[in-house]
């Protein structure tokens, strides 16, 4: 409903990963300009999740229509010599479920009242990831 071009912001909650495992959710609120596009909002959320929960591992966001987000989980370029990876650190058998829950919950934002995406597809190396 915000049609004014004032600098009003919307608050988007981010649930942090390490606290997921302890079942002790810590929530951080993200202030985003209300008049930014849906893709910009989702990118901002993804950027914060990446830095707060996933060691700054890259993710690429693409919005289809007004309601589907396709998120690609990308590895760091090998030349950067980073010691962290999606595959080894966040998509292994022990933690994959928590990783996907954190990504989905934070990107879907079910409590958010404004226009938002309805569906998230997470991809790693071209494969659609799922919880089973």
Q: Would you name each region that the model predicts?
A:
Residues 1-132:
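Bimodal "functional hotspot" detector
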């Amino acid at each position: 409903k915000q049609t004014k071009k004032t600098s009003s912001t919307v608050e988007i909650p981010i649930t942090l990963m390490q606290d997921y495992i302890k079942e002790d959710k810590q929530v951080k609120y993200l202030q985003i300009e209300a008049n930014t596009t849906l893709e910009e909002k989702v990118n901002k959320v993804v950027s914060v999740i990446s830095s707060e929960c996933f060691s700054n591992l890259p993710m690429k966001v693409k919005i289809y229509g007004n309601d589907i987000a396709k998120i690609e989980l990308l590895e760091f370029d090998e030349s950067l010599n980073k010691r962290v990876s999606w595959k080894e650190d966040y998509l292994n058998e022990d933690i994959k479920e928590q990783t996907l829950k954190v990504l989905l919950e934070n990107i879907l934002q079910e409590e958010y009242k404004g226009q938002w995406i309805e569906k998230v597809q997470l991809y790693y190396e071209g494969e659609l990831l799922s919880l089973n």
